[in-house]
Amino acid sequence: MKFNKIKSYAKINLSLSVNGKLKSGYHKIESLVSFVNYYDEILIKKIKNKNHKIQFIGKFSKGINKNNTVSKLLDILDQKKMLNNQKYLIKVIKNIPQKSGLGGGSINASAIIKFFLSKKVFNCSKNNLKNLTKKI
């Protein structure tokens, strides 16, 4: 099977307001963002395997550990049985630097969710989607 190729665009915060802390330890924020023509490329295909395979390659892939947003997303989707036991090979070609404030990791997870929704891998209401993304 051929890879599906998607782009995961970087975002720039035009306005950012920190409004306290959440129980998770993360900050509660309100932000106005704009997307720019700078992106990671993500290759996705179904595999016949027991587990998902996730690979990060490219100049900004060094140091990405197993506790990344793509792995977290797939773990949550598996736990909720939203992927119907289907496994995927996902290759992320990192062009967006880590921890640069450009949203690389979270934007990657978001692009994968958008891809799965467009391919009707699962259906999800806006409310359920909001709850899902809070866990990543």
Q: Which positions does each model-derived feature cover?
A:
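FabD-like malonyl-/acyl-CoA
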Residues: 40, 128-136
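Short pre-catalytic strand/loop immediately N-terminal to key active-site residues, enriched for Gly-Thr
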Residues: 88-101
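DPxDG-like acidic metal-binding loop motif
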Residues: 102-129
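Start-of-domain marker
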Residues: 62-63
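N-terminal, positively charged, Ser/Thr/Ala/Gly-biased leader segments
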Residues: 1-57
